Regions:
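Glyoxalase I/VOC metalloenzyme domain signal
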Residues: 1-27, 31-57, 67-170
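A binding-site-centric feature that preferentially detects glycan-recognition modules on secreted/surface proteins
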Residues: 62-65
């Protein structure tokens, strides 16, 4: 994880955008399984390391949230207490070499992020769903991403559990 954090920061530093990522809290780290079998193995592997794990069907796949007992070391981004474990979309395979698909940085206002990225001509895309809005920046040739999000995965998960949309595993 520290190597990924450094690569993410170097990407933004190379565009003169270090101020975008300095001191931003990492909301969570997301890993994508190669297939359903590996996804299930990840759940079994991480379950003993959590205070709570839940999952939610998202279309034809499942996405789990693991609340870790001991935070992950995210290098210069600090500690991360949430891990998102994603089953790949049908027909898709994970392309990342070290299992990390993306990290999400929590920001109260996405407008300064989009303005700074536009000003430096950094390619990004917007991701909007019922849970949150995110600015997504691909940082390397493996398709790994940094996402700036306006809502915490913990808050999203709490809402989904309360509504019965997500189920607790532990």
């Amino acid at each position: 994880m520290p190597a990924y954090a450094e690569e993410a920061k170097l990407f933004f530093y190379s565009y003169g955008l270090a101020d975008l990522v300095i001191d931003l809290p990492v909301d969570h780290v997301a890993i994508k399984a190669l297939d359903r079998k590996v996804y299930d193995q990840y759940l079994k592997t991480f379950l003993p390391l959590t205070t709570r794990m839940s999952f939610k069907p998202v279309g034809p796949r499942d996405i789990a949230t693991a609340e870790l007992s001991t935070p992950l070391d995210a290098g210069t981004f600090g500690a991360v207490e949430l891990l998102e474990i994603m089953e790949p979309k049908p027909g898709a395979i994970a392309t990342t070499h070290d299992l990390i698909d993306h990290i999400e940085l929590l920001v109260p206002d996405l407008e300064p992020i989009t303005k700074a990225l536009k000003d430096k001509e950094v390619i990004y895309k917007m991701q909007v769903n019922e849970n949150h809005t995110a600015v997504v920046v691909e940082i390397n040739e493996w398709g790994q991403e940094v996402k700036f999000t306006d809502r915490s995965l913990f808050d999203i998960t709490e809402k989904q559990i309360a509504k019965g949309a997500a189920k607790i595993i532990s």
